[in-house]
Amino acid sequence: MEMPKDYNIEIEKQIQKKWEESKIYKFDEESNKPPYIIDTPPPYPTGRLHLGHALNWTYMDIIARYKRMKGFNVLFPQGWDCHGLPTEVKVEEIHGITKSDVDRHKFRELCIELTKENIEKMRRQIKSLGISIDWDKEYITMTPEYIKKSQTAFVRMYKDGLIYRGKFPVNWCPRCQTAIAFAEVEYKERESKLNYIKFPAADGEGHLLIATTRPELMAACVAILVHPEDERYKHLIGKEFIVPLFGHKVKLLADEDVEKEFGTGAVMVCTFGDKTDVLWVNRHKLEIKKAIDEKGELTEIAGKYKGLKTEEAREKIIEDLKKEGYLVKQEPIKQNVGVCWRCKTPIEIIVTEQWFVNVRKLIPKVREVADEIKWIPEHMKIRLLNWIEDMDWDWVISRQRIFATPIPVWYCPKCGNVVVAKEEDLPIDPTKTGYVCDKCGNKDLIPETDVLDTWMDSSITPMVITKWLDDDKFFEKHYPVQLRPQGHDIIRTWAFYTIVKSVALTGKKPWDEIVINGMVFGEDGHKMSKSRGNVVEPDEIIAKYGADALRLWASNSVVGDDVQFLWKEVDYGYRFLRKSWNACRFAKMHISDDIIDELKKPMEISNPIDLWILSKLQRLIERVDKDLENYRFNTIVEIYKFVWHEFCDNYIEMVKYRLYGDDEEAKKEARWTLYYVIDKVVRLLCPFAPHFSDYIAEIYKIDNLHFSFPEVDNRFINEEAEKFGEIAKNTVISIRRFKANSGMALNAPLKYVEIYTEDEETYLALNKTAEDIKGTLKIEELKIIKGKPALESKIVEIIPDKSKIGPEFKKNAKAVMDLIKNADEETLEKIINEGLETEYGVIRKEHIKDVKRALFCEGEEVDSVDIEGVLAMAIIRK
């Protein structure tokens, strides 16, 4: 089979089609091979695969392909985490409606329809990357089958006392109008004002100055706190003060958590400004007042400010405080504000009835399980442990939305019973299906309209892919799974919640190992965003350079680190593939299809250059194997170095003379080595550039590519061959460079070359590889000589500087120039060092424009070449 002249990225589509039709990556449930199961992250179906996805999926695919080649039965599924607010918002935007305009179930159908479209788009993009997924193992969280499992997890955890309903402070997004978990709160720095406000004493004697950034919460102020050791306020503890503008009285209390140095050291406690307020309210058993409602507007306790959004209310209250003389001063301040991770709206803390997972009860076991899991890189575990240590709230799992897994619960208005669905009735939507109270028999129950947090769906993925609830035998055999790959940005959500659910439902760890990838930044070094204009789409890269070049860019990074996208690195990967293609094409000109079967058989190799490349190849195989075992994907750099520099630039150049020569045995050995190296390199490349590898394997009839990783052949590990080969390689490189610098063609013949060395090992190496050096460099006669060359530097020509001699010596200028031209070494030295007294005047070094010298050996003019990295010198006779 002939190879086309140029590497064409269009072959990738043909190869992807071949893989899909053959189902080559299908997980074999009957196989006796050891299983390797990857808990693939299910992306949110936005309809667009971004570069961060491409990085993560490349990492996963390298692992999957490597493990398959190492003899594992790999289960590499694809999931879709469908539910969530962004889809609801998009549906409202597309159809020009709000979710309250249409029937709840109709709205859900519109969300499902959009999600299906988006999944199809992203499925195509994942396939275009060449990801070796078993598409028969795809799961979608909005399907009845998945919802049943999500609801079953809820029911079982409720029965075990790990899920409860209660009225507690929760993080609330006014834009999304739903509760959110602490893990979904991001923090953004913003400029604000610290307002110093007078609180008059209730007895009329003076006032207390407090500092706050949130005067809009003053209507819900329930106390003022100071540090018990603060000398400024010790005598005032227990005294009452009046909240300005709102008129109600609050007590001054002592608490050791107050920072004396912040503001005035006196802080107002409101329900609720932040987490600390919640802590203080519980600790001091303070009254709870609802300052802000679910829409982010002030409530009736705010009086004339009722109905105002927080920002607007803040402005008006500050204005009134100024008018009334309560505002003393304002200072600029930078503060970290909690915002919703989806819409970036500042969150509020409000008291509502919600469903919670009692994560605090599970923390000791979660910590224990986290230690059982191998974290790559290891320091990423600290992020999870720090998150656990700081956790003082339970996980709020109810959401006030529509497009999500329904909470399978009803409420009995007669007896107050909370009715939870039986497992055999799942999946179930309480808003569509009635139920009977198991206490009083009432059939007229109130359905729960809240839905589950999407993390409640995605936190059971390792259980779902191992057939939890469907096949007990399969589940027991395959759970926990081997690997979870994910981003560091969701350690405190997806990783944490998955461990929580696994501990709660199975008592086991969910996976043996977790590999963490970083974020992708733009060429400008900033996070990719449309507003910055630094977004690069995977489709754009694939269209220009192909999927394999994109994969090579992704591979050349360190697990856990953030990665900067650079077009030049993609281009480098593409040029590497073209270079490799050209090398394979050259080799194929000498390896016809009819001799390939013979080349697959073992062969005794004696040529030192063949032995050199074969030994170097074994080192590469060993290195790449070890690196991939430890998730060091940037081992691709080692493959680059070997293929580009050792194989293409050097070995192929050094083997050409044999391939084009008349020695059939030498030719046969060269062909065998070429085929062997290409076979092994293609296999090493396969996890990184599978399309390229597959196509070369087809051309070269390489067997079992996707299921056989190369093994080190100890027969070919030969330290002496490596040393000798390096000496020969450096000799060839140095003399080829001499040819290029001398304006000679690289294939121009050299009549006679002597290589001198005083080093014994170098002398042996040069003698051993002399025929290859001679043949590669087209040297007619080559001598390897032990010792030093008797070199002598002689003047060939001295060029006078006419521009300086003429004006100075005038009519004697010609005589001076003749004297300079004919100067011997002694005369030249005198001119240069001290000046030469003549009848015409003093001749100095500035009168000489140039001195041309030549090397002579045994009376014959020669060129000399210092051989880079080798204790040797080549003498080239002219």
From Swiss-Prot:
Keyword list, A-Z: Aminoacyl-tRNA synthetase, ATP-binding, Cytoplasm, Ligase, Nucleotide-binding, Protein biosynthesis
Main location: cytoplasm
Compartments, record wording: Cytoplasm
Superkingdom of the source species: Archaea
Known EC number: 6.1.1.9
Function of the molecule: Catalyzes the attachment of valine to tRNA(Val). As ValRS can inadvertently accommodate and process structurally similar amino acids such as threonine, to avoid such errors, it has a 'posttransfer' editing activity that hydrolyzes mischarged Thr-tRNA(Val) in a tRNA-dependent manner.
Similarity annotation: Belongs to the class-I aminoacyl-tRNA synthetase family. ValS type 2 subfamily.
PANTHER family in the record: VALINE--TRNA LIGASE, CHLOROPLASTIC_MITOCHONDRIAL 2, VALYL-TRNA SYNTHETASES
Protein name: Valine--tRNA ligase
Gene: valS
